[in-house]
């Protein structure tokens, strides 16, 4: 642990639609703290509704940082988020206040507490080579290449995960070492693991499924169609992360009149439930035993479980 790691931070993890944002606001009010986005999709602009970013009313209740600050035309990495958090925590006006990290991206939480892996720079020539092959051959073909050259990391990646497959191949060619080996070398942590309050929400699965369905119907009614229309007007590369946000493909199909409203909503709800299941599985298997598990945000405040770090 780095000596200058922030002490007494609050970390709130959990699947989408589990009530994390409401809990974070309640904690910010109780502690005078500020909220930091810890979700890789909520960093992108334009998609306020589809990425379930805090509403204007939410933003008025507590200070929020690192939401919607990245243009959807960009690719935003864990490393860039780490740099942005480091700069944020160094701001004078935030010193002495409790940072409340809330979101559903496990790798962000891992970086906060354990530091970032010291992966090497890759030459433009190598990068262009593999990205060109990805564009020409597709993710499945390059995943097959990775299975031969680096089977250990290939087994850990989905065959459709084009960004991470290319990164693994780039690093292997540039250094002769697997990305897994580089990932073992950690940098400094930003948050002190020992003093942090680490909370993970694990709601009832049936309850979460109903909540997801209701939330997406509300998104549709509140303007998700207009969001996707605005995104499509930017004429972006379909491979960009923002273009892969749940709901974008379905609403796009509705706008193209190749899918009905009902089917677009149903498919988006199914995709969101599947995503929530993957998130829950990751948190269950990857977070340490010192993370306290709650069924809801309300439960955190019951029985004196929550302690004000101030």
Swiss-Prot record:
Pfam name, any one: IPPT
Gene Ontology molecular function, alphabetical: ATP binding; tRNA dimethylallyltransferase activity
UniProt-annotated binding residues for ATP: 14-21
Catalyzed reaction equations: adenosine(37) in tRNA + dimethylallyl diphosphate = N(6)-dimethylallyladenosine(37) in tRNA + diphosphate
Renumbered residue ranges of the record's region Interaction with substrate tRNA: 39-42, 163-167
Cofactor section: Mg(2+)
Residues engaged in binding substrate: 16-21
Feature type site, description Interaction with substrate tRNA: 105, 127
Domain of life: Bacteria
Gene3D superfamilies reported for this sequence: 1.10.20.140, P-loop containing nucleotide triphosphate hydrolases
EC class: transferase
Function: Catalyzes the transfer of a dimethylallyl group onto the adenine at position 37 in tRNAs that read codons beginning with uridine, leading to the formation of N6-(dimethylallyl)adenosine (i(6)A).
PANTHER family: TRNA DIMETHYLALLYLTRANSFERASE
NCBIfam families reported in the protein's UniProt record: miaA
Record family assignment: Belongs to the IPP transferase family.
Quaternary structure (record): Monomer.
Protein name: tRNA dimethylallyltransferase
Gene: miaA
């Amino acid at each position: 642990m780095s000596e200058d790691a922030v002490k007494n931070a609050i970390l709130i993890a959990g699947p989408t639609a589990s009530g994390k944002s409401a809990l974070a606001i309640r904690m910010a009010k109780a502690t005078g703290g500020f909220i930091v986005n810890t979700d890789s999709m909520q960093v992108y602009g334009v998609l306020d509704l589809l990425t379930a970013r805090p509403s204007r009313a939410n933003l008025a209740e507590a200070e929020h940082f690192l939401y919607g600050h990245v243009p959807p035309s960009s690719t935003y990495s864990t490393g860039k988020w780490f740099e942005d958090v480091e700069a944020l925590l160094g701001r004078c006006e935030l010193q002495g206040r409790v940072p409340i990290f809330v979101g559903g991206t496990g790798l962000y939480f891992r970086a906060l507490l354990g530091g970032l892996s010291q992966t090497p720079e890759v030459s433009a020539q190598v990068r262009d080579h593999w990205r060109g092959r990805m564009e020409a051959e597709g993710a499945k073909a390059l995943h097959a290449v990775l299975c031969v050259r680096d089977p250990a990391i290939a087994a850990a990646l989905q065959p459709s995960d084009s960004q991470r497959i290319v990164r693994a191949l780039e690093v292997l060619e540039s250094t002769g070492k697997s990305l897994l080996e580089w990932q073992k070398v950690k940098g400094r942590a930003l948050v002190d693991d020992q003093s942090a309050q680490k909370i993970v929400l694990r709601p009832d699965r049936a309850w979460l499924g109903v909540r997801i369905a209701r939330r997406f119907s509300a998104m549709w009614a509140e303007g998700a169609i207009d969001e996707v229309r605005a995104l499509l007007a930017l004429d972006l590369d379909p491979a960009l992360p923002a273009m892969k946000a749940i709901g974008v493909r379905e609403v796009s199909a509705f706008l193209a009149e190749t899918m009905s409203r009902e089917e677009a909503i149903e498919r988006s709800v199914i995709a969101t439930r599947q995503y929530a299941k993957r998130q829950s599985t990751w948190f269950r298997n990857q977070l340490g035993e010192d993370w306290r598990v709650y069924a809801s945000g309300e439960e955190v405040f019951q029985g004196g479980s929550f302690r004000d770090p101030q």
